[in-house]
Amino acid sequence: FVDAPRIAQRRRARALVDAGADLVLGHGPHVLQEVERLASPRGEALVAYSLGNLVSNQGLRYFAGRRVPEHLHPAVVSPATRDGAWLRTTFAVDEGRVRVTALEAVPLWTRNNFLDVARGRAERLDVRVRPLARASAALRAERRPVIAAALGDAVRLVEF
Protein backbone atom coordinates (compact mmCIF):
# COMPACT_ATOMS: atom_id res chain seq x y z
CA PHE A 1 0.00 0.00 0.00
CA VAL A 2 2.82 2.34 -0.92
CA ASP A 3 1.61 5.50 -2.66
CA ALA A 4 4.88 6.33 -4.43
CA PRO A 5 7.12 4.16 -6.59
CA ARG A 6 10.11 2.71 -4.77
CA ILE A 7 13.63 3.28 -6.05
CA ALA A 8 13.76 -0.31 -7.32
CA GLN A 9 10.57 0.25 -9.35
CA ARG A 10 12.02 3.38 -10.91
CA ARG A 11 15.24 1.54 -11.77
CA ARG A 12 13.33 -1.33 -13.38
CA ALA A 13 11.20 1.06 -15.38
CA ARG A 14 14.29 2.95 -16.53
CA ALA A 15 15.96 -0.33 -17.57
CA LEU A 16 12.88 -1.37 -19.55
CA VAL A 17 12.72 1.99 -21.31
CA ASP A 18 16.45 1.88 -22.05
CA ALA A 19 15.91 -1.59 -23.55
CA GLY A 20 13.28 -0.19 -25.93
CA ALA A 21 9.92 -0.24 -24.13
CA ASP A 22 7.67 2.66 -25.09
CA LEU A 23 5.06 1.88 -22.42
CA VAL A 24 5.58 0.30 -19.00
CA LEU A 25 2.48 -0.62 -17.00
CA GLY A 26 3.26 -1.52 -13.41
CA HIS A 27 0.87 -2.84 -10.84
CA GLY A 28 0.78 -4.33 -7.39
CA PRO A 29 0.56 -1.90 -4.45
CA HIS A 30 -3.29 -1.74 -4.47
CA VAL A 31 -3.16 2.07 -4.71
CA LEU A 32 -2.46 4.60 -7.45
CA GLN A 33 1.08 5.71 -8.17
CA GLU A 34 2.32 8.34 -10.57
CA VAL A 35 2.49 8.21 -14.33
CA GLU A 36 5.55 9.82 -15.87
CA ARG A 37 7.13 10.46 -19.23
CA LEU A 38 10.75 9.41 -19.61
CA ALA A 39 13.28 10.18 -22.29
CA SER A 40 14.04 7.02 -24.24
CA PRO A 41 16.46 5.93 -26.96
CA ARG A 42 13.51 6.18 -29.38
CA GLY A 43 12.26 9.53 -28.09
CA GLU A 44 9.75 9.39 -25.27
CA ALA A 45 8.33 6.57 -23.15
CA LEU A 46 5.53 6.37 -20.65
CA VAL A 47 5.65 4.65 -17.25
CA ALA A 48 2.53 4.02 -15.15
CA TYR A 49 3.82 2.64 -11.86
CA SER A 50 0.39 1.54 -10.62
CA LEU A 51 -3.14 2.16 -11.87
CA GLY A 52 -4.69 1.26 -8.52
CA ASN A 53 -7.05 -1.52 -7.58
CA LEU A 54 -8.76 -2.59 -10.78
CA VAL A 55 -10.50 -5.75 -9.60
CA SER A 56 -11.50 -5.25 -5.99
CA ASN A 57 -10.40 -3.35 -2.89
CA GLN A 58 -9.50 -3.67 0.74
CA GLY A 59 -11.17 -0.51 2.04
CA LEU A 60 -14.43 -1.21 3.84
CA ARG A 61 -15.29 2.49 3.83
CA TYR A 62 -14.80 4.99 1.10
CA PHE A 63 -14.66 8.44 2.60
CA ALA A 64 -11.49 9.62 4.33
CA GLY A 65 -11.27 10.65 7.97
CA ARG A 66 -12.50 7.44 9.56
CA ARG A 67 -10.68 6.27 12.65
CA VAL A 68 -8.91 2.95 12.13
CA PRO A 69 -9.60 0.44 14.92
CA GLU A 70 -6.32 -0.78 16.40
CA HIS A 71 -6.94 -4.41 15.43
CA LEU A 72 -7.29 -3.59 11.71
CA HIS A 73 -4.62 -2.90 9.13
CA PRO A 74 -5.05 0.73 7.94
CA ALA A 75 -5.60 -0.51 4.37
CA VAL A 76 -8.84 -2.15 5.47
CA VAL A 77 -10.45 1.26 5.81
CA SER A 78 -8.28 3.27 3.42
CA PRO A 79 -10.28 4.92 0.66
CA ALA A 80 -7.16 4.88 -1.55
CA THR A 81 -7.57 1.13 -2.08
CA ARG A 82 -10.81 1.84 -3.92
CA ASP A 83 -9.23 4.30 -6.38
CA GLY A 84 -8.11 3.28 -9.84
CA ALA A 85 -7.54 4.73 -13.28
CA TRP A 86 -8.19 3.65 -16.83
CA LEU A 87 -5.22 5.04 -18.76
CA ARG A 88 -5.72 6.25 -22.33
CA THR A 89 -2.71 7.31 -24.32
CA THR A 90 -1.73 7.97 -27.90
CA PHE A 91 1.76 7.64 -29.30
CA ALA A 92 3.06 9.08 -32.56
CA VAL A 93 6.08 7.75 -34.41
CA ASP A 94 7.79 10.12 -36.81
CA GLU A 95 11.00 9.07 -38.54
CA GLY A 96 11.59 6.45 -35.86
CA ARG A 97 11.09 8.88 -32.96
CA VAL A 98 8.32 8.14 -30.48
CA ARG A 99 6.37 10.75 -28.59
CA VAL A 100 3.31 10.73 -26.38
CA THR A 101 0.65 12.91 -28.01
CA ALA A 102 -2.19 12.34 -25.54
CA LEU A 103 -2.25 11.11 -21.95
CA GLU A 104 -5.58 10.86 -20.18
CA ALA A 105 -7.06 8.82 -17.37
CA VAL A 106 -10.64 8.00 -16.47
CA PRO A 107 -10.88 8.02 -12.65
CA LEU A 108 -12.34 4.79 -11.29
CA TRP A 109 -13.61 3.67 -7.91
CA THR A 110 -14.71 0.34 -6.49
CA ARG A 111 -18.25 0.03 -5.25
CA ASN A 112 -18.30 -2.56 -2.47
CA ASN A 113 -21.32 -3.25 -0.30
CA PHE A 114 -19.54 -5.73 1.99
CA LEU A 115 -20.60 -3.86 5.15
CA ASP A 116 -24.23 -3.73 3.98
CA VAL A 117 -24.23 -7.51 3.49
CA ALA A 118 -22.47 -8.08 6.83
CA ARG A 119 -25.08 -5.93 8.61
CA GLY A 120 -28.05 -7.54 6.83
CA ARG A 121 -28.90 -4.46 4.75
CA ALA A 122 -28.19 -6.26 1.45
CA GLU A 123 -28.54 -9.90 0.45
CA ARG A 124 -25.83 -10.20 -2.19
CA LEU A 125 -22.29 -8.94 -2.36
CA ASP A 126 -21.85 -6.33 -5.09
CA VAL A 127 -18.25 -5.41 -5.88
CA ARG A 128 -17.73 -3.43 -9.10
CA VAL A 129 -15.12 -1.14 -10.56
CA ARG A 130 -16.87 1.83 -12.18
CA PRO A 131 -16.12 5.32 -13.44
CA LEU A 132 -15.93 7.85 -10.61
CA ALA A 133 -18.39 9.97 -12.61
CA ARG A 134 -21.13 7.52 -11.56
CA ALA A 135 -20.45 8.06 -7.84
CA SER A 136 -22.20 10.55 -5.58
CA ALA A 137 -21.24 14.22 -5.80
CA ALA A 138 -19.62 14.07 -2.33
CA LEU A 139 -17.53 11.07 -3.31
CA ARG A 140 -16.45 12.68 -6.59
CA ALA A 141 -15.51 15.89 -4.78
CA GLU A 142 -13.32 13.99 -2.31
CA ARG A 143 -11.66 11.42 -4.55
CA ARG A 144 -11.09 13.24 -7.87
CA PRO A 145 -8.39 15.59 -6.51
CA VAL A 146 -6.75 12.68 -4.68
CA ILE A 147 -6.68 10.60 -7.87
CA ALA A 148 -5.31 13.53 -9.88
CA ALA A 149 -2.55 14.13 -7.33
CA ALA A 150 -1.62 10.44 -7.22
CA LEU A 151 -1.26 10.17 -11.01
CA GLY A 152 0.70 13.41 -11.31
CA ASP A 153 0.73 16.43 -13.58
CA ALA A 154 1.45 14.46 -16.77
CA VAL A 155 -2.08 13.02 -16.78
CA ARG A 156 -5.31 14.83 -17.66
CA LEU A 157 -8.41 13.36 -16.00
CA VAL A 158 -11.42 12.84 -18.26
CA GLU A 159 -14.91 11.47 -17.68
CA PHE A 160 -16.21 8.29 -19.27
How does the language model describe each region?
Residues F1-A4:
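Short acidic, glycine-rich surface-loop motifs adjacent to enzyme active sites
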Residues I7-A85:
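Conserved beta-sheet core of the metallophosphoesterase superfamily
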Residues L60-F160:
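A short C-terminal boundary segment appended to hydrolase-like catalytic domains
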